[in-house]
């Protein structure tokens, strides 16, 4: 078949394509036999791999460090899901809790989703340093992947992140 679409694999924050081990990224990419394969870098997911991050500037530095560690493999990053989520303190607290999960499937599922949304918040970047991140990676596809509860909140968050991309400090 002569497919023309890009096949992009998104990094996650659980074992698999975490973008923290270049040898694993290389291994995964080598098993995909398609010319237009690549990576969709979710910045928030990569941030979850470092529980010590305290600021957006630290997060941008961390992401750039991980991209640099990938060397030539970084050229496979064709897209970005741009968002930030600095939740290491929450995760550290969660890890130490001994609370049992509900045994009822529906209640357990609800509890899991609540934790996931506390960890993976999809907030806008507000630091102008994010401009360097996007300029370094030069993605073909850039998605402002932001979570909101309505159109007006989404617009506010989008305006904030776009301002940061233009170098404005919020």
Show which residues each predicted segment covers:
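Active-site acidic/histidine proton-transfer and metal-coordination neighborhood
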Residues: 1-38, 48
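Gly/Pro-rich active-site loop or hairpin
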Residues: 18-22, 47-139
């Amino acid at each position: 078949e002569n497919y023309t679409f890009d096949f992009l694999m998104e990094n996650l924050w659980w074992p698999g394509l975490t973008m923290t081990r270049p040898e694993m990224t290389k291994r995964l990419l080598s098993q995909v036999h398609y010319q237009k394969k690549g990576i969709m870098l979710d910045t928030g997911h990569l941030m979850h791999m470092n529980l010590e991050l305290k600021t957006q500037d630290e997060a941008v530095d961390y992401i750039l460090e991980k991209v640099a560690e990938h060397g030539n493999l970084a050229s496979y990053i064709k897209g970005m899901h741009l968002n930030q989520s600095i939740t290491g303190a929450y995760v550290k607290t969660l890890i130490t809790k001994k609370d049992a999960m509900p045994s009822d499937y529906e209640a357990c599922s609800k509890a899991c989703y609540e934790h996931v949304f506390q960890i993976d918040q999809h907030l806008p970047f507000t630091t102008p340093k994010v401009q360097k991140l996007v300029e370094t990676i030069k993605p073909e596809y850039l998605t402002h992947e932001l979570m909101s509860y309505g159109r007006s909140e989404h617009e506010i968050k989008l305006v904030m992140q776009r301002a940061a991309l233009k170098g404005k400090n919020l």
